[in-house]
Regions:
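Auxiliary tRNA-acceptor-end handling modules of aminoacyl-tRNA synthetases
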Residues: 43-341, 359, 374-450, 458
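Short alpha-helical catalytic segment bearing the HExxH-like zincin motif
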Residues: 351, 453, 457-465
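Active-site recognition of the HExxH zinc-binding catalytic motif
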Residues: 356-357, 460-475
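Zn2+-dependent metallopeptidase catalytic core
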Residues: 97, 340-368
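Hydrophobic h-region of N-terminal signal peptides that target proteins for export
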Residues: 32-40
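Conserved catalytic/binding loops enriched for acidic/polar residues
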Residues: 479-517
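Sec-dependent signal peptide recognition
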Residues: 24-30
């Protein structure tokens, strides 16, 4: 019995040990499986796995990078300009929203100079401002004709005028992207520069075709973006615009579906933050005006006032100027002379500008105005940029010259002025000299008038147009103060001329008779 009992205990122990060993074996198998799984996890990842993981970790491409990831033309300045496959994008910084600008258009090339003249500005520039909301950027034309008297108008009156003369929206552009540091927005402005914008049309109101009824159709497929430039206070965009046009007069069609292509240079110029102090015109002085309607509580009516057009001519040394000394201005008035003029003309054109230094000297300025050749080594110079005032040669059979100017509408300050001298001005001078002076001057009794005579006539014409550029209107009363018999006196005419103002239309001395000198 004892042996049987021991045997039973031994059998139970063996059974227990066997179960324990089986459990150990299972644990070992499980451990081996885990080790194998870990080893498998540490194996090099497949290329597909790497791509998936890289894609997950790579930051999302921004709208800005998507727009400009391909190679394209960029111009940096007041705005950053991007030309992407013929589309023009403006990158407008936050600091320039709300700043007033001038948008002007100049004709750089044209296929038909009867429609417009190279170098001319077909219309007045637009005063514009950029505004924005969260979704879009608005290009607005500034409504500044109605003003209030700062000292005599209440805030309520000023707000009422503002509400009733809000700035209209010329264009509304979707915000395409923000730049990388979120300080500027990007908009596509192609439709402002490669489109038919009536306010910037290449068909000049001074062209020969204004005598006819003109119907034009813009040809988008033949139009394209050109050169872009950007500077610290302006940007320049050149584009080629194509049209077909028809000319009629009454029931007669003179030209039908005639093609025209013009290269236009558009300048967007930042206006000074603080406008020049306006000066109210004096009716006794013939100066060009900019009209305003003044609303004031001190007046019992809306009052029309006029700001005089004038250059910002300020003494460089105010104390010396007040003592009566002649001083140079802080900024000289400069006219750049077109290098396309016939060589014989140039000398007389430079003299025409320089002679204006005499009247400026009488008000205390020396070297107030100058004529200079087109600069060869200035990368910023562009005669079609409204920053530069020029005297332009127009090879067209028009017997005339003209001197328009552009002003800051807020103050009347002249910002740009150009003289256009048409080729047949020489024909006009030839006719004037022969008809008006041949009876007393045998030198003009010829098919070709000597340079000393016709050159002096050209100087007179250009000086008259420069006077317009300085803000002066015609003064038809100037010659009325000179008695007729004085016009036959050599001593008088050599000292005083034939009129008291070059802005008169007193061409030449047609009162002189044979024998007078």
């Amino acid at each position: 019995l004892l042996w049987n009992g021991r045997r039973n205990r031994d059998e139970k122990n063996l059974e227990h040990n066997s179960k324990f060993q089986q459990m150990i074996r299972k644990l070992l198998v499980l451990l081996l499986c885990l080790t194998a799984a870990t080893a498998t996890a540490k194996k090099p990842k497949s290329s597909a796995s790497k791509k998936a993981e890289s894609s997950a970790e790579k930051p999302k491409e921004s709208d800005y990078d998507k727009l400009f990831k391909e190679k394209h033309t960029v111009a940096d300045g007041m705005f950053r300009l991007h030309d992407v496959k013929g589309k023009l994008y403006f990158e407008i910084p936050d600091s320039l929203f709300g700043r007033e600008m001038l948008l002007g258009s100049t004709i750089s090339e044209v296929s038909d100079n009867a429609a417009a003249t190279t170098g001319s500005k077909s219309d007045y520039p637009l005063q514009v401002v950029f505004t924005r909301n969260d979704r879009s950027v608005q290009l607005r034309t500034v409504n500044c004709e109605n003003i209030t008297d700062e000292t005599g108008a209440s805030r309520a009156l000023a707000e009422a005028v503002k509400r009733n003369t809000a700035d209209p929206i010329l264009r509304n552009y979707k915000i395409e992207a923000w730049n990388r540091d979120s300080t500027a927005v990007v908009v596509n402005v192609t439709d402002l520069f490669v489109a038919d914008v009536e306010e910037m049309s290449p068909f000049s109101k001074y062209g020969l075709y204004t005598a006819f009824e003109l119907k034009k159709t813009f040809q988008k497929e033949r139009s394209m973006l050109g050169e872009i430039k950007a500077f610290s206070d302006n940007v320049v965009v050149r584009s080629t615009l194509s049209y077909i046009f028809t000319l009629t007069r009454g029931r007669t069609t003179l030209v039908k579906d005639q093609p025209l292509t013009a290269v236009m240079t558009r300048s967007l110029v930042l206006l000074p933050r603080e406008p020049y102090r306006p000066r109210i015109t004096d009716s006794r002085m013939s100066v060009f005006p900019t009209g305003k309607v003044l609303f004031s509580e001190r007046e019992q009516r809306a009052k029309v006032i006029y700001y005089a057009h004038r250059w910002r001519l300020e003494p460089s040394d105010m104390d010396a100027w007040k003592r009566g000394e002649r001083v140079a201005p802080k900024k000289q008035i400069v006219f750049y002379v077109d290098d396309g003029f016939p060589e014989m003309w140039k000398k007389h054109i430079f003299e025409a500008v320089d002679q204006w230094n005499e009247p400026f000297g009488r008000i205390g300025f020396k070297n107030a105005i100058a004529a200079k050749p087109y600069p060869k080594d200035d990368p910023e110079f562009d005669p079609d940029n409204i920053k530069y005032s020029c005297i332009r040669y127009a090879p067209i059979a028009i017997a005339n010259a003209m001197g328009p100017s552009w002003v800051d509408p807020r103050s009347g300050e002249i910002l740009n002025a150009s003289v256009y001298v048409y080729h047949d001005v020489m024909k006009l001078l030839n006719n004037w000299l022969f008809v008006q002076t041949a009876q007393a001057d045998e030198r003009v009794r010829a098919v070709t008038i000597p340079e000393e005579v016709i050159g002096d006539g050209l100087r007179y014409v250009v000086a008259h147009e420069v006077g317009h550029c300085l803000g002066y209107m015609h003064n038809m009363s100037a010659s009325a103060v000179i008695p007729v018999d004085s016009l036959r006196s050599p001593s008088f005419t050599q000292k005083y001329g034939t009129t008291t103002s070059i802005m008169d239309y007193a061409r030449f001395n047609y009162v002189a008779r044979p024998g007078d000198r």
